[in-house]
Amino acid sequence: MDNKEKLMERPINGVALRKVTTFSQKTEASNFAQRVLVNPFERNKILRMYHDAKRILEAKMPCPLMAVVYPSYVCNHNCQGCSCQELDIKENVFLDPQNFAKLLNSLRYLKIKSIEFSGGGEPTLHPKFGELAERAANEEFELGLLTNGSLLSDRLADQVVDHFTFIRVNIDASDMQIYNKMHCPPEKYGFQVVMNNLEEVISKKNKKNSKLTVGAKVLVCQSNMNFIESVINLAKDIGCDYIQFKPMRNAKDSLLPEQVGEVDGLIRALQEKYYPFLVCGGAKSSKSNRKCWLSPIHLVVDPLGDIYPCCHYQFRRESTRMGNLFDQPIEKIWFGERHKEVIRNLRVEDCNLYDCRWHYYNEVMWQIIEEDKMHLNFI
């Protein structure tokens, strides 16, 4: 037998069948799995929600899998197109720590398994953020964090490494000049501070042999479109596990229509060039022709305790607010008529103002369930 081949035996009905698989074939299959399946952005993991999606189409409300929690409505950066600017909330900007226990109890009642801390504002600006995260972790919630990274040092870095499943830091640029143009941060929360903090988190992760996934995020715009490869190199050299690109929307610096295709093509080419380092996303915006109906697979809670169907509520707060979990039992909010009314009143033209993964989720699950395009009764 050629030394490039390996014999694999597979018993069927007591008979050993000999199958020859070349190392090159195994490597190709392994590479495919790593490239296509084994990453946090594999969009087809929505298929695990098949039975819940069927319940929604049957006018039944499932329990959500994940909660997005906003600990803060304030931020120490001033980024273009940020929802924090649009909301412009001045009072009760932090989640009350005394209400956090009630929040966790409500999530547990709904059998929620994971919490993503994001914003809103910058979640780590909450004076008790580390304590809130530790409490949630001790109550066996899986945790994720979306952050600008400006406060990820010392004890908070340890808490993230010890208790979180993933963290994604919005870096946006590979040098201080472009970063400052996009983020407008105070000097003490600027580019070099963020990079130092990111390096500290990764160093602690490696020393502790933590399974934490550390990612970098880039909003692609006119200011950074010529520096795509350099920001990939930055994330890779620091030790990030991946970098994700998304288009900046609804801002003066958003890509012009004639720029989108070229930049998206560049990102696709760099995905191949830098493999196996994971380069995700692109520069094209998502749109949907179908009204959003899958929002109940998650919920969003703001610092006031108000519950919304998704994170893109900043310009339609009144029409999408479902209730307040600090004032009402969560079961009356989640399974109540107001929740159903909010879903009925969602408009696709509003949803298309933002780049949203639910565009894909809604379409795929509709085709699978209503149109049976996957022929699920066949393997």
Feature map (PLM): residue ranges:
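Conserved radical SAM core fold
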Residues: 123-124, 149-154, 169-188, 223, ...
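Glycine-centered loop/turn positions within well-structured domains
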Residues: 77, 176-177, 308, 328
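Accessory C-terminal segments flanking Radical SAM cores
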Residues: 2-10, 15-19, 63-68, 248-252, ...
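Conserved alpha-helical substructure of the radical SAM core
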Residues: 7-166, 192, 255-266, 363, ...
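Residue-level signal for well-ordered alpha-helical positions
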Residues: 85, 182-185, 313, 336
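Short, basic/glycine-rich phosphate-binding loops at helix/coil junctions
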Residues: 82, 175, 310
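Conserved C-terminal portion of the radical SAM core fold
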Residues: 66, 110-118, 137-144, 165-171, ...
